[in-house]
């Protein structure tokens, strides 16, 4: 006669219970750890981008770096904290004064219809290209005493492969901008008056 195994012995057996409990907790725990790591790296990338841009802009405002050197400086400094697939773009726009940032070139003599540029109007050619522009800025570092707007965009793949799981984009970006006035190492060139 064969004895039947006692099921009560299996019910009382506690060996391996921790492994089963850890199995329930492991996946959410890994997600939380990777999520915190991803958010922490994003904050770190933003802080480094801001610091590098501030240093480059300060050096450019006193004439230490030219436009090409700024791009190289920022790329070299950022290469230590970003992946090989990352892209860095630097935008430099100069303005004659603070009040002209983001505004069209100033109309000096306005003919009908008033309030908008049309043929026969005279305007202050702030960017020196000889045509009326809806943005008075010009690309580059400008000259002495000019206002320069710097913007850096860094885009790279995320460190952890969990972006799709949480609905995040597969790439992370860091953007930083700063506005500085160049030092007055010479007289500021006044914008020309152009009439059409």
Set out the residue ranges of the language-model regions:
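Alpha-helical assembly-interface signal, strongest on the long, hydrophobic N-terminal helix that forms
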Residues: 1-78
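Short, conserved structural patches
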Residues: 2-3, 54-196
């Amino acid at each position: 006669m064969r004895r039947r195994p006692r099921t009560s012995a299996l019910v009382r057996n506690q060996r391996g219970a921790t492994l089963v409990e850890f199995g329930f907790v492991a996946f959410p725990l890994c997600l939380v750890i990777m999520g915190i790591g991803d958010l922490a790296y994003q904050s770190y990338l933003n802080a480094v981008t801001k610091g590098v841009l501030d240093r480059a802009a300060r050096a450019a405002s006193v004439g230490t770096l030219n436009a090409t050197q700024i791009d190289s400086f920022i790329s070299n400094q950022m290469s230590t904290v970003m992946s090989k697939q990352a892209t860095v773009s630097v935008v430099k726009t100069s303005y004659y004064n603070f009040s002209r940032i983001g505004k069209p070139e100033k109309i000096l003599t306005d003919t009908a219809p008033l309030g908008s540029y049309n043929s026969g109007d005279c305007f202050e050619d702030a960017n020196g290209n000889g045509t009326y522009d809806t943005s008075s800025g010009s690309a580059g570092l400008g000259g002495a005493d000019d206002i320069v707007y710097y913007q850096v965009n860094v885009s790279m793949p995320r460190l952890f492969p969990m972006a799709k799981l949480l609905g995040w984009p597969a790439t992370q970006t860091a953007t930083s901008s700063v506005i500085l006035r160049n030092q007055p190492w010479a007289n500021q060139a006044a914008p020309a008056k152009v009439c059409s």
